[in-house]
Regions:
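A conserved hydrophobic position in a structured secondary element of the catalytic/binding core
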Residues: 142
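Cell wall/extracellular polymer interaction/catalysis modules
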Residues: 1-137, 145-163
Length: 163
């Protein structure tokens, strides 16, 4: 199954056309940390992460991971765990994925810059939730109902094609 991001506000999967939003500064073939752009390319999908205190276990064929209070994603290009899931500590700092808002109640890792990770080339690129469709820091976001549809359709061989 292929998720296709056709433009800044349209995602297609199977016979579904869904509303989405992308990075504030659009798309790029040359992503770097903090540019607020969504990376162009075709990428594998990683695990689906979810807050079991807020949402049900997702119905999907992807690997599922529960988000705990101390979970984070390393966005420090100088850290050996750059662009990896981490347990937050004084030593390992990063983006908190156990958030007060709803954005990461469900999210899917997009395997951008994940194999042979290159520092400063961008981190924490996810397909996550939104309520207002405001542009993101580089991720792709959909509403809750769309995420449920997407999760049900995906399998371990699924990919996402951005532009």
């Amino acid at each position: 199954m292929l998720i296709n991001i056709k433009n800044k506000d349209t995602l297609t999967i199977d016979e579904f056309t869904l509303k989405c939003c992308v990075g504030k500064n659009g798309f790029t073939k040359n992503k770097f940390e903090g540019d607020n752009k969504t990376p162009i390319g075709t990428y594998k999908l990683g695990s689906v992460y979810y807050r079991k205190d807020r949402v049900n276990q997702p119905i999907t064929k992807l690997k599922k991971k529960i988000i705990n209070f101390n979970h984070g994603w390393c966005n420090d290009p100088k850290n050996k765990f750059y662009n990896k899931e981490i347990i937050l500590s004084k030593k390992n700092k990063g983006e908190k994925i156990f958030r007060k808002d709803h954005k990461y109640n469900y999210f899917i890792e997009i395997k951008y810059n994940s194999t042979k990770t290159k520092p400063y080339k961008g981190s924490a690129i996810f397909l996550h939730l939104t309520k207002n469709f405001k542009p993101t820091a580089g991720c792709i976001a959909v509403d809750f109902d769309s995420m449920i549809i997407i999760l049900k359709l995906l399998n371990k061989k699924s990919k996402i094609r951005i532009c």
